[in-house]
Amino acid sequence: AQSVVDLGCGMGSYVRHFSREGLRAIGLDGNPSTPQLSKGACGVLDLSVIAEVAEPCDWVLSLEVGEHLPKVYEAAFMENLNRFNTQGMVLSWALEGQGGTGHVNEQSNDYIKAKICALGYVNDANAEASLRQAAQFAYFKRTIMVFRRTAWQDGMTQG
């Protein structure tokens, strides 16, 4: 991968890390204070509204974001995950009953996997297992999921 977008980037920690590693990294978050919180590294995007994406990245990263959006916005959020990548996504979504500040749409891994795979992805179980094993936070050991595109759409080319 040469580029990644972090949807729901918070303070931009992953964006700064990926940039230091030589990737083109973009961070977007629904919080209007994101530019200040990220020291100018990231921008603002309402992830509950389907975005027009001029230049998608190779991969999307979105960790513990979907559960903060009411279910009515779930499909739009997932479409944004889809539109912002050309190769795949690394996603985590709080599990039902996990609990957490602002969690309004916790879902099972199976539910999320079915929804994302219906958009034209396959679950990369090997990459997922590697990331879960390496995860520092206990909840990531249960919630990290990896998806790869199965088909290229509208002139997208494999990078």
Positions of PLM-derived features:
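Conserved SAM-binding loop
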Residues: 2-97, 110-113, 148-149
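A generic fold-level signal
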Residues: 37, 139-140
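Phosphate/oxyanion-binding loops and surfaces in catalytic or ligand/nucleic-acid-binding neighborhoods
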Residues: 84, 118-122, 147-153
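C-terminal alpha-helical "lid/dimerization" subdomain adjacent to the S-adenosyl-L-methionine
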Residues: 94-102, 124
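Short alpha-helix
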Residues: 105-120
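Conserved S-adenosyl-L-methionine
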Residues: 121-132
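Short proline/glycine-enriched turn/loop segments at secondary-structure junctions
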Residues: 133-137
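Flexible, glycine-/basic-rich loop-and-beta segments that form/coincide
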Residues: 141-159
